[in-house]
Amino acid sequence: MAYKEELAALGEISFEKIRRVAYNYVISLPEEDRNALFDSLNHGVNLLDSDAQMKLYMYSFGKMHQAKVYRALQSLDLNVFTQNDFDVVDWGCGQGLATVCFFDYLKTRHITNRAGNIILIEPSDSARERAEIHVKAYVEPHTNVRCVGKYIDDVTEEEIKSESPVTIHFFSNILDINSIDLKRLAEKLGASVQGQQYIICIGPMNSGNR
C-alpha cells in the first residue's frame, strides 16, 4: 500500500496516527535491520531519502519533536489565529512535523485552521514529498501548499513572500547548523516582512542551547 493510501485509511488525521503508521512498520523489522537503519539517521542529522528512514525518524524522534513544538507554541497568543487567515513557512521542514504539530495544537484549542498558504522548504526530495502529503491531509483543497526544494541559504525573498495578515515561521532543529548564514537569513526575513510575523525556533535539548 502506498504511503498516501496508508494515511487516507486512518480517517481524521493527527500526528499520533501518522506516527502509528511509522511505529507499525518499525516494530516489524528485525532488530539488526532496525539498528542499521537507526545508524543511517546519524542522530536525526542526515537528510532522509527513503521511506524506511523517514518512518524510523518519526518513530524515534517524533514524540520529542511534538513536545518541543507544543512547548514553544504555549508562548503565543493564539487569538491572532482565530481572527485572521495566516500563512506558514516551514524552514528545513523535513517531513513537515512542525507544521503538522501546529495544526494539531490549534485543533486541541478548538481553533479553526485558517491557513491560506503553506511554504515547505526542504532540500531532500523524499522528505519534502512526504511533508506535502502530511500537510495536505490537514487542509482544505483550496489551500496553497508550495514546496521549495532548496537549502535555506539558497531560498530567495520572493519564495517566502507572504501577503496574509499573519505569518508563522518554523525553524525546527535547523538553526544550529554551522553552514547556515544567519545574518543573510535575517536580512531575507526582514525584507519579506508584511503584517504580523511569528518566528518559532526549536533546537536540540542540550545545555549549549539554553
Describe each region flagged by the PLM.
Residues 1-40:
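N-terminal auxiliary segments of SAM/dcSAM-dependent transferases
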Residues 45-79:
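Class I SAM-dependent methyltransferase Rossmann-like catalytic core
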Residues 129-162:
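S-adenosyl-L-methionine
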Residues 195-206:
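Conserved beta-strand signature within the Rossmann-like core of class I S-adenosyl-L-methionine
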